[in-house]
A protein has these predicted regions:
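A short helix-loop-beta submotif of the ANL/AMP-binding
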Residues: 136-143
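Conserved PLP-anchoring active-site segment centered on the Schiff-base-forming lysine
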Residues: 113-135
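Short acidic capping loops at alpha-helix termini that bridge into adjacent secondary structure
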Residues: 91-97, 117-120, 167
């Protein structure tokens, strides 16, 4: 029996795992050194956790809880709330803050919680492919707006406005942008 992928992924494409990856492999075979910065794992490039962090983790292991509150650790949520209060951001309480095991988990959870079938989400292009996948899997329709290299990858406001419809449920803004790095 052959298992095929869901048709919900029909519009999902991750170029770095497609033609770009094949080209990178070919260059490696020719002897070129390729830094695969797309994998999201900084350790192979020498970016490791500071020793102080590692020691804190080791020291706290004996008292670590199996599960935290479903919204995340209270102390971390409180620190985030206090940070934004110091920045004079109003209306953020500790109950408004949710933490997860990384941005990927939070993207998927937020799209599942927010979208009904057919809802549209405006996503920057080029995009971090998980956004398109998460929207599609949640039954939504990804609609890409332009972030033009000639404009330092900033979002094109006219393009965004032109793509807003009665079905638009959300607008994704990422700062700094992934994958362009625009701030």
């Amino acid at each position: 029996m052959q298992v095929s992928k869901s048709n919900k992924l029909a519009n999902v494409c991750y170029d770095i795992r497609g033609p770009v990856l094949k080209h990178a492999k070919r260059l490696e075979e020719e002897g070129h050194r390729i830094l695969k910065l797309n994998i999201g794992n900084p350790a192979p490039f020498g970016f490791e956790a500071p020793e102080e962090i590692l020691q804190d983790v080791i020291r706290n292991l004996p008292t670590a809880q199996g599960y935290s509150d479903s919204k995340g650790l209270f102390s971390a949520r409180k620190a985030i709330m206090q940070y934004y209060q110091q920045k004079q951001v109003e209306g953020i309480g500790i109950e408004d803050i949710y933490l997860g095991n990384g941005v990927s988990e939070l993207i998927v959870m937020s799209m599942q919680a927010l979208l009904n079938n057919g809802d549209e989400v405006l996503i920057p292009a080029p995009d971090y492919p998980l956004w398109t996948a998460a929207v599609s899997l949640a039954g939504g329709k990804p609609v890409h707006y332009l972030c033009d290299e000639q404009a330092n990858w900033w979002p094109d406001l006219a393009d965004i406005k032109a793509k807003i419809t009665p079905n638009t449920k959300a607008l994704v803004l990422i700062n700094p942008n992934n994958p362009t790095g625009a701030v």
